[in-house]
Every structure is written in C-alpha cells, then in structure tokens.
Amino acid sequence: MTAKPNFRLITLNFQLSTFNSTMLYERTLGQWLEHWATNTPDKEYIVYSDRNLRFTWSQFNRRVDDMAKGLIAIGVERGTHVGIWAANVPDWLTLLYACAKIGAVYVTVNTNYKQAELEYLCENSDMHTLCIVNGEKDSDFVQMTYTMLPELKNCQRGHLKSERFPYMKNVIYVGQEKHRGMYNTSEILLLGNNVEDTRLDELKSQVSCHDVVNMQYTSGTTGFPKGVMLTHYNIANNGFLTGEHMKFTSDDKLCCCVPLFHCFGVVLATMNCL
C-alpha cells in the first residue's frame, strides 16, 4: 500500500475588507520618487555594494531627471516603448523611472533570451528604443542586436531605419563603451542638457497613474509570450501593500537578489521601497 504524502493544509485568512479604496494611492512612480526626494533627500535609496555606489533619494531623482531629458532628446515621449535588456546594473532603475516620469512604457527583456526571442519581443512590442549591456553568460547582446538590426552599423545614431522593425529608432548601450550606431549612457545624459526643464515638466504633468508604465512578457509556456500591461497605480500599490504585510519600515533595507526584469524584482522588490 502506498502511503499518503503528509501534506499540511495552510489556510490564509485574507481580510479583503481591510483593503479599502483609501489605502490605494493615486500617484505615478515619478510622483512617488519626487515625494521621497523632497521629504527625505539625504536618506539612502539605492546601494550597489559591489560597485561602491550609493544614491540618496535626491541624488537618484536628479539623475533620473537628467536621463529623462536625454530620452526626450532622442524622441522618447508619452506612450513610447523603451526596452531594457540588462541584468541589475545601476542605471536599470534610472531608466525605469526616467521613462515613468515622461509617460513612456518600460519593456523588460529577459536576459536569457536568444536571437529569435529577442526579435519576437522587439517586433511584438513596437519597441522604439532598446537599451542593452554587453551580455550575460554566453550571450553577446551587442552582436545579437547587430544581427537583428543590420542597418545599425552604418547609420547615424538616432536615425535607424529598419525594414523589419519600423518603430525602432535608437539603441542605447548602458555604459561607457562606444558601439557603431548606438548611443552610450554619457551621450544620452549630454544630449539632455539641450532639453529645457519646462519640457520635462510638461511631459510629467501629462502622466496619469492609470497610464501603462511597464510591459512584461509572459514565459510563453503555452504559446508565444504576451505583453502584460501594468500601470503606475498597479505596480506601486502592489509593492506598497506587499511591504505593509511584511511590516517594512523606513529603517529596513531590502536586498534585491532576483533579476529586475522579472515581476519579482521590478515590482515586489523595487516598489516595496517606495
């Protein structure tokens, strides 16, 4: 006779009544960032211990504004789809909040993707700007991007014309290396100096908390991956309520050891800290 497995039934007493509408905040991610940059300017927000990088809320907010103006300079605006194909590098979050402030949609790309998967996602998402790093493990992201966009090596930066990817106009290398046809991070920040603060403020004022801010693709287990549209309201409150139930306070520190491209990293980890 086969013994029955010793399963223990766990009952979760989830009180829906406690989640009334007054607990859900109607703020954009940009507004959340500016709230903490104003109220706790000198408190640390992000620490990269392996790179000896530390940002307070006010320092990070300034870098986000500079990055946002750089994105505006290359044609990114409300509704533009910006992809990030990178592991947890420092400017991953900078680019997320920069997109959020100007109403662009941040498309997260799995770092395990190979050529066909990358091309499918870029085409399906109508991606306008792709941000990349050198690669992960045995994958060369730079070479794979050139394979996908053969026109890139021979075009002026910001003037990409791809027959297969008509929406794609820019590729940004997240770092200081220079690659043909691509901007690097420093060049984007430099271009932002030509954008007036009033233009940034204008775009910020048009963003609603109910706008889509993040597009995450499903794993594709039962078919082609599908882009899931997530709003500012959705992910900010998701992170807030999760943090509330874990009893997080402003004195706690959260170690994010999961990929930021996944919902666990970008929502449950990052948004908890808001």
Q: Which ranges hold each PLM region?
A:
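AMP-dependent adenylate-forming
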Residues: 32-56, 178-179
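Conserved AMP-binding/adenylate-forming core of the ANL superfamily
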Residues: 45-97, 114-119, 184-193, 206-207, ...
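Conserved AMP-binding
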Residues: 86-89, 110, 248, 258-262
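Conserved pre-ATP/AMP-binding loop-to-beta segment of ANL
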Residues: 41-44, 164-168, 172-179, 183-217, ...
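Structural core segment of the AMP-binding/adenylate-forming
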Residues: 102-191
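Conserved AMP-binding/adenylation subdomain of ANL enzymes
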Residues: 236-253, 261-274
